Design a protein with these regions (language model features):
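ATPase catalytic-site recognition across NTP-hydrolyzing enzymes
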Residues: 1-42
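Gly/Thr-rich phosphate-binding beta-strand-loop-beta motif of the actin/hexokinase/Hsp70
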Residues: 32-58
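Metal-dependent DNA phosphodiester-chemistry modules and their immediately adjacent helices/loops
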Residues: 66, 93, 112-199, 205
């Protein structure tokens, strides 16, 4: 990926997603099914000025879709109560199984959802690293489908790999030097959309 800086294009160091692979996953006219199981994921930027909400649903076969539902911006600081209220409105529109979030960035929002009966689940550490791997694998194999939303594309292609542990990696919020809340939320939503219904992906006969 290349980024424009001072009217010059420079390569993004160690990008997570290849623009050509992302483009190959684009499917025109994708829409969420109001009757299908839905997983939501929310992520906030480290400075708490940006946030994004992403939904995922399974499609036919082993494919699934991710859709950017909403973004937030506040030049000072986001209001966790306002975000929780907005998110609750989306929960009412679809059969949401749970809302995934990072305890590092969105714990205040999640804490407001639980009393309303909305199931939440944190994804951090090894689980977050796994979700990043799952996102990249789904993109490279074209199991992931997206509608080509400009903002989601921008954020996903801005994500940079950050080494994690011995041989692992994650999408680094700070090292990306850009807003990647949508990319992080996509990874978390992917984690649930890629799970097999019976818990088994491979059957040996």
């Amino acid at each position: 990926m290349r980024t424009e800086v001072l009217c010059q294009w420079v390569d993004t160091i160690n990008p997570v997603i290849s623009p050509s692979q992302w483009e190959s996953c684009k499917v025109e006219g994708l829409r969420l099914n109001p009757e299908s199981d839905t997983w939501l994921a929310i992520d906030l930027s480290p400075d708490r000025k940006q946030a994004a909400l992403v939904a995922s649903q399974k499609l036919e076969g082993d494919k699934f879709q991710v859709i950017l539902l909403q973004t937030w911006h506040n030049p000072s600081n986001l209001d966790d109560k306002a975000l929780a209220n907005d998110l609750a409105e989306w929960v009412r529109k679809y059969p949401v199984q749970l809302v995934a979030y990072s305890a590092r960035t969105a714990s205040a929002v999640a804490a407001r959802l639980a009393p309303a009966g909305i199931r939440t689940e944190p994804i951090d550490g090894l689980d977050y690293a796994q979700s990043c791997d799952e996102l990249l694998g789904a993109i490279s194999s074209q199991r992931l489908a997206h509608s080509g939303q400009d903002e989601l594309t921008k954020q996903c292609l801005s994500a940079v790999k950050l080494p994690f542990g011995d041989g692992g990696w994650v999408m680094g919020r700070k090292v990306s030097n850009a807003v990647i809340c949508g990319a992080v939320a996509s990874a978390m939503a992917t984690h649930y959309a890629t799970k097999a219904n019976d818990g088994v992906d491979i059957v040996i006969v």
